[in-house]
């Protein structure tokens, strides 16, 4: 438990700004800044995002989704299309895997284990499938799509807490036919907000990844966000 990860709880942030923030934090790693391992925890306004395989999402598809009141972004993460929005805990781990284990497969597996442990803490039986992510039976509760650059990770996971699941009706989530989506609130039949889930996620991440965490220094947070807003 000697590895240290800084936790940055932002609240609501646009997807565009989150991309800029991730690039900044990745750059800190590549500049060999100390103590750069960071978990960014936030929620997004409604947005559909695709991964590196974007051929099946022509511009008309993007326009149709935007007409629903959501943004649309193409990204360099793995995976196909998914939705982010209010009531969903999005976590972007910006980690140097050389501080853990330099393997993207190991990393994705441990992200899945983290979310499964979180679900277990709430009394939900969750697991994996041949498809990436965390599932409750045939319904995906957490999407995972990551990117690695010289073993520095970006993008991450999206866990449905109290998400409006009707947003997913307009897409084939993660490109997987015949499967559904669910949320912590739906499975527990009560409202489960992001604020309740964050501490459970952090504890589960600490246990699975063998690290401990501290809050990201507020002054450093303010300085970075000020640069992004300009």
Residue ranges with predicted function:
Residues 91-93, 132, 144-146, 157-161, ...:
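A structural signal for short, well-ordered beta-strand segments
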Residues 1-135, 140-141, 166, 191-192, ...:
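N-terminal lobe of the biotin/lipoate ligase/transferase fold
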Residues 97-99, 148-150, 161-163, 188:
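Non-catalytic surface loops within mature trypsin-like serine protease
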Residues 56-60, 141-161:
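Short, conserved beta-strand/beta-arch hydrophobic-aromatic motifs that form part
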Residues 166-230:
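C-terminal accessory segment of soluble enzyme catalytic cores
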């Amino acid at each position: 438990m000697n590895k240290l990860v800084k936790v940055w709880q932002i609240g609501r942030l646009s997807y565009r700004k989150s991309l800029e923030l991730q690039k900044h934090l990745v750059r800190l790693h590549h500049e060999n800044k100390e103590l750069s391992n960071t978990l960014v925890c936030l929620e997004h306004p409604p947005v559909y995002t695709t991964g590196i395989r974007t051929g099946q999402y022509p511009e008309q598809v993007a326009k149709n989704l935007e007409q629903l009141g959501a943004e649309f972004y193409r990204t360099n993460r793995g995976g196909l299309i998914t939705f982010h929005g209010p009531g969903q805990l999005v976590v972007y781990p910006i980690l140097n895997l050389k501080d853990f284990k330099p393997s993207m497969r190991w990393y994705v597996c441990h992200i899945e284990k983290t979310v499964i442990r979180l679900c277990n803490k709430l009394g939900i039986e969750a697991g994996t499938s041949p498809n990436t992510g965390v599932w409750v039976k045939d319904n995906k509760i957490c999407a995972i799509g990551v990117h690695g650059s010289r073993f520095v990770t970006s993008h991450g996971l999206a866990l449905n807490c109290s998400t409006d699941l009707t947003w997913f009706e307009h897409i084939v989530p993660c490109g997987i036919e015949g499967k559904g989506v669910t949320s912590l609130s739906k499975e527990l039949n009560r409202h489960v907000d992001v604020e309740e889930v964050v501490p459970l996620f952090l504890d589960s991440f600490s246990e699975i990844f063998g690290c401990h965490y501290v809050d990201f220094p507020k002054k450093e947070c303010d300085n970075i966000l000020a640069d992004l807003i300009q």
